[in-house]
């Protein structure tokens, strides 16, 4: 079915914003988070221990106290307000009753998850002239033992004491003045913390790093653009183009412990929309990289958009799924890409299995049997003659995480229906300055809109769609209560029926939502949290009468 868009909310929906916590319960003591707990995160749904909840990227919780029969009774329990406005894209961690939160400008907090009471705060002294593109955001922590790991806008990786917020170690990964930055939530694998760099709009050379969790010593670095003479270097027209070729890695990857493979997505080549100086496929931009997490060695890669001219990063969370396909058990990697196609790969070797459009696209006839796009014969953008293209530069989806429910067998994707008119604007590279080579403006012929789409990963078919007024930036969460939680640019926090897409509940938060929700359990009660504006809001069903 296709659900209707959410209508205007009555003023009473805002009443919860006047709710304040008057009595703060004592928080639980910080506890050791073992690697075994992280490996088996799905077995401990009371906590939220890593960016996607589990290594496979499912963002699914087996908690079901909140379900489609009672979700209409959800009510705000507490609200925490950060002092820093901006794009609040954080995924909180919850460990034994303590919530760990990051906010714009690399602020960080520990909160009592019962009440929202602040336990400690960390504020980084950032340089005045940061080069970070697209908002001074941060997407969250990783944790192991009593160490929290934070990747910062000035291109450092930091370990904090989870009990106090004190700095345990701080290492510089790159020079922020050259355009390097971190916005990614780190990922812990074994005894390493793994991060991918931002800065594709500044002509950086992208990389993925692994650091020793105890000391901060860098263990390995994988450059996402090959050095001269390395495999893939011939996909760049010159060493100079490759040296400033971008391919950042700014979204958290996923991990298969059985195969011991780390799957990390990469972003656009640089300059993002002018290919005149970088002819070729531009490896390993717009790709999924399968790396050995012990060594950083590349095991295989798959590139979605060779020679990208539209800023279509592949920095969307790769989702791992074990299922039958065409009558055979397969280990799959699912990827709804910014270019408008949904891809299914064999994650053991990177073999392309199939792809289908999941949003409007006007640049390709389809994808061939090898996984390469079959391009339409369209004119190239000029400095004065623009070319309308769908999707636009922000993509048919973007960094906002999808979720997968084993209950329904569906992948839930935030889709964006937005087209842009692209122009070229050639420019010379200057270190530390924006290096785009183009400009683009929204198409005036079609209004943008958004949707949550439920995709069958075995066929690529869209089972249902929930339409939203604007092209949204919220991720989603699915639960065993037959629910999908999401948000929209109009500030609505929404619960949908996971089987049908029917809207079951919503509340107006007062600000646009740019984050994915999480869920956790305390003292037998299930909670759901979402970031909105400068607020972190937490909801639950009414407490049982005593």
Residue ranges and their predicted role:
Residues 206-217, 281-296, 349, 450-456:
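Beta-propeller blade signature
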Residues 444-498, 502:
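Loop/turn-rich, solvent-exposed surfaces of beta-rich toroidal or solenoidal domains
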């Amino acid at each position: 079915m296709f659900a209707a868009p959410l209508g205007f909310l009555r003023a009473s929906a805002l009443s919860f914003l006047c709710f304040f916590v008057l009595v703060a319960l004592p928080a639980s003591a910080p506890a050791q988070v073992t690697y075994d707990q992280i490996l088996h995160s799905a077995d401990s749904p009371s906590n939220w221990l890593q960016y996607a909840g589990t290594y496979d990227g499912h963002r699914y919780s087996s908690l079901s106290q909140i379900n489609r029969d009672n979700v209409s009774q959800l009510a705000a329990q507490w609200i925490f307000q950060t002092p820093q406005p901006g794009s609040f894209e954080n995924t909180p961690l919850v460990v034994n009753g303590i919530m760990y939160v990051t906010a714009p400008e690399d602020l960080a907090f520990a909160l009592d998850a019962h009440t929202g009471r602040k336990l400690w705060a960390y504020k980084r002294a950032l340089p005045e002239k940061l080069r970070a593109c697209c908002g001074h955001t941060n997407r969250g922590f990783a944790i192991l033992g009593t160490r929290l790991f934070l990747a910062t806008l000035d291109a450092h990786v930091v370990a904090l004491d989870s009990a106090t917020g004190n700095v345990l170690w701080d290492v510089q990964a790159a020079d922020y003045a050259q355009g390097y930055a971190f916005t990614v939530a780190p990922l812990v694998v074994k005894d390493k913390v793994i991060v991918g760099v931002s800065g594709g709009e500044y002509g950086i050379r992208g990389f993925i790093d692994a650091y020793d969790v105890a000391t901060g010593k860098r263990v390995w670095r994988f450059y996402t653009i090959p050095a001269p003479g390395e495999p893939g270097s011939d996909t760049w027209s010159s060493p100079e183009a490759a040296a400033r070729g971008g391919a950042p890695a700014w979204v958290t990857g996923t991990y298969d412990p059985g195969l011991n493979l780390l799957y990390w997505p990469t972003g656009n080549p640089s300059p993002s929309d002018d290919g005149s100086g970088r002819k070729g496929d531009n490896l390993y931009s717009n790709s999924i990289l399968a790396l050995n997490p012990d060594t950083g060695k590349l095991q295989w890669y798959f590139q979605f958009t060779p020679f990208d001219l539209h800023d279509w990063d592949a920095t969307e969370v790769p989702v791992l799924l074990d299922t039958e396909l065409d009558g055979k058990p397969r280990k799959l990697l699912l990827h709804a890409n910014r270019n408008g196609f949904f891809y299914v790969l064999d994650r053991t070797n990177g073999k392309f299995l199939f792809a289908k459009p999941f949003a409007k696209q006007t640049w390709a006839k389809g994808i061939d049997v090898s996984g390469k796009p079959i391009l339409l014969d369209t004119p190239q953008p000029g400095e004065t003659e623009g070319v309308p293209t769908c999707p636009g530069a922000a993509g048919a989806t973007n960094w906002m995480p999808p979720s997968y429910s084993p209950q329904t067998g569906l992948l839930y994707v935030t889709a964006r229906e937005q087209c842009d008119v692209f122009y070229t604007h050639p420019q010379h590279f200057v270190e530390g300055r924006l290096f785009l080579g183009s400009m683009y403006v929204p198409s005036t012929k079609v209004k943008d809109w958004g949707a949550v789409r439920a995709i069958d990963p075995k066929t690529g078919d869209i089972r249902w769609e929930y339409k939203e007024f604007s092209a949204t930036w919220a991720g989603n969460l699915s639960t065993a209560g037959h629910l999908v939680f999401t948000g929209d640019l109009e500030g609505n926090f929404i619960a949908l029926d996971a089987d049908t897409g029917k809207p079951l509940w919503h509340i107006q938060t007062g600000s646009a939502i740019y984050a994915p929700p999480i869920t956790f359990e305390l003292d037998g009660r299930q909670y759901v949290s979402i970031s909105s504006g400068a607020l972190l809001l937490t909801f639950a069903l009414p407490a049982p009468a005593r």
